[in-house]
From Swiss-Prot:
It is found in: Cellular thylakoid membrane. GO terms for molecular function: oxidoreductase activity, acting on NAD(P)H, quinone or similar compound as acceptor; quinone binding. It is a peripheral membrane protein. NDH-1 can be composed of about 15 different subunits; different subcomplexes with different compositions have been identified which probably have different functions. Its EC number is 7.1.1.-. Keywords: Membrane, NAD, NADP, Plastoquinone, Quinone, Thylakoid, Translocase, Transport. It catalyses: a plastoquinone + NADH + (n+1) H(+)(in) = a plastoquinol + NAD(+) + n H(+)(out); a plastoquinone + NADPH + (n+1) H(+)(in) = a plastoquinol + NADP(+) + n H(+)(out). Belongs to the complex I NdhM subunit family. NDH-1 shuttles electrons from an unknown electron donor, via FMN and iron-sulfur (Fe-S) centers, to quinones in the respiratory and/or the photosynthetic chain. The immediate electron acceptor for the enzyme in this species is believed to be plastoquinone. Couples the redox reaction to proton translocation, and thus conserves the redox energy in a proton gradient. Cyanobacterial NDH-1 also plays a role in inorganic carbon-concentration. It comes from Synechocystis sp. (strain ATCC 27184 / PCC 6803 / Kazusa). This is NAD(P)H-quinone oxidoreductase subunit M. GO terms for cellular component: plasma membrane-derived thylakoid membrane.
Length: 121
């Protein structure tokens, strides 16, 4: 039986890819990162996500393979990707089909306003 978790930027399936098909498996998890290409990735950032995925899967070793457990892993990965975005390790893809800034508005450094705050009275 295929068990899956789908978040905005991470899709996890209890299956392996053969050709263009997902073949259900109780022993293999397959992850699709950022299927809508919302972000610009470098190889290092992508590898960090894969390593974090491996760590999370290992932490559930011995647990039942359930939708709930996969959703928890997917949710943790969403937070991890947000951390990468906020650290500047990935950025929004401005050529994406739809710009929705699902992880928050981009922050642009401006030398003239750095460290200054305005209060409207």
């Amino acid at each position: 039986m295929l068990v899956k978790s789908t978040t905005r930027h991470v899709r996890i399936f209890s299956a392996e890819v053969q050709g263009n098909e997902l073949i259900p498996s109780n022993n293999v998890l397959t992850m699709d990162v950022d299927p809508d290409n919302e972000f610009v990735w470098n190889e290092d950032a992508l590898q960090q996500v894969y390593r974090r995925f491996d760590e999370l899967v290992e932490s559930y070793s011995g647990e039942d393979l359930t939708d709930y457990n996969l959703r928890r892993i997917g949710s943790d990965l969403e937070h991890f990707i947000r951390d990468l975005l906020q650290a500047g390790k990935v950025s929004y893809n401005l050529d994406c089909r739809v710009l929705n800034y699902s992880m928050g508005l981009p922050k642009v450094e401006n030398q003239e306003t750095a460290g200054k705050y305005w209060l409207d009275n």
